Design a protein with these regions (language model features):
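Extended, non-catalytic subsegments within catalytic or DNA/protein-binding/adaptor domains
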Residues: 1-362
Length: 362
């Protein structure tokens, strides 16, 4: 609007109420582009709350709700209503992430054996395995954007705790051995992996607001299967080795997911770009997708695919909605939008029909 004033454009809406509604509509569009207080995109319902707050502030001086054409109207004005409608319509378009699946993980584990144990690929594979078991959100184990400096991880300044690192750090883990000995942090690797009976991880910062929640995991006796305990143990060993190279790594402040980058010869944090690059290459190899011709489809694999994949597998294996909510730390049934018609479900259906056909029907 300052630009308009500088060019001496005339106001097309000299009417105060109409001008105010235009401003509120532009504010809603501004918010929809990610210009919120947290500099990220927000839902249409949240945008309505932002606009409501702005309109309430204005009404405290003017005594008029400028969101409506007339004070007696029950609905939004003719300018603001279409903006709200389009925002909700845009949200309803399905743009779901594709699931990270066991086939992709099997390929990832084979590839990891070709790289040094402290390099990016083995670190990613361990992070993927943890995420698949615990339903990690991106910020719970990695960094958004290209943030890779181990001394500058993402922090949560909204919690009053000594540890404010958003991603889990070595000190967030504790174990109980088969001989009932307890240990935490980097001291865990002083034990042999085979004697660890239970492991707890503390999520100090969660999207659902349940800060400080702890989850229990046990060690999978199958050495080739998914195992949260084993993958964390390898990550702790990697952290300990890299700490020798970079003493700045802190068990209480530095995220667990670190790796050695040989080109600049330094320790780095795993970032979302690393995750997306590797996961999309895995998807391309498993599903025979070309990087250029299928680039739009490959964009649907990201860090969130770990949570989606875990949800799909648990549902296909017969876990109840309550079980999935509890295991993957959902506070609602929002995970339902991620479910897929996978081969496991089709096979389970046939088995159920065959068992039913073998029983007396009447």
């Amino acid at each position: 609007m300052s630009w308009d004033d500088n060019l001496t454009f005339e106001d097309p809406s000299p009417n105060l109420a109409l001008r105010a509604q235009y401003q509120l509509a532009m504010y809603a569009l501004h918010l929809s582009c990610g210009h919120s207080i947290y500099c990220r995109s927000i839902k249409a319902a949240t945008i309505e709350q932002y606009v409501f707050a702005a309109a309430t502030l204005i009404a405290s001086f003017s005594g008029v709700d400028f969101r409506k054409d007339s004070p007696s109207d029950k609905h939004m004005g003719h300018i603001l209503a279409p903006v709200y409608r389009d925002l909700k319509k845009f949200e309803s378009v399905p743009d779901r992430r594709e699931p990270y699946d066991p086939q992709m993980h099997a390929l990832a584990k084979r590839l990891a054996t070709r790289f040094p144990r402290d390099s990016l690929v083995p670190a990613l594979v361990d992070g993927f395995e943890q995420g698949y078991c615990a339903g990690y959100r991106l910020t719970e184990w990695a960094q958004s954007g290209n943030r890779s400096d181990p001394t500058k991880p993402q922090l949560n300044h909204m919690v009053s705790a000594t540890i404010r690192t958003r991603a889990v750090v070595p000190d967030d883990f504790r174990v109980l051995t088969t001989t009932l000995q307890r240990s935490a942090g980097l001291s865990i690797i002083e034990f042999d992996l085979t004697v660890i009976a239970k492991m707890w991880v503390k999520f100090r910062t969660q999207k659902n607001g349940q800060h400080g929640e702890e989850k229990l995991f046990t060690r999978n006796p199958n050495p080739s299967g998914f195992c949260f305990v084993s993958s964390v143990f390898r990550a702790l060993q990697r952290f300990h080795r890299l700490r020798v190279k970079d003493p700045r790594l802190s068990p209480s402040k530095t995220p667990l997911s670190v790796y050695w980058d040989p080109r600049p010869q330094c320790v780095k944090l795993i970032a979302s770009g690393d995750i997306e690059m590797f996961m999309r290459r895995l998807a391309g190899a498993v599903y025979n997708m070309h990087p250029a011709r299928h680039s739009a489809d490959l964009q649907k694999w990201s860090a969130h695919s770990l949570r989606v994949g875990a949800c799909v597998v648990l549902h296909a294996m017969g876990f109840s909605a309550l079980d999935i909510q509890w295991i993957l730390r959902w506070r609602s049934t929002a995970f339902m939008v991620y479910l897929r018609n996978v081969a496991i479900l089709a096979t389970q259906q046939y088995l159920a029909l065959d068992r039913g056909a073998a029983l007396p029907f009447i």
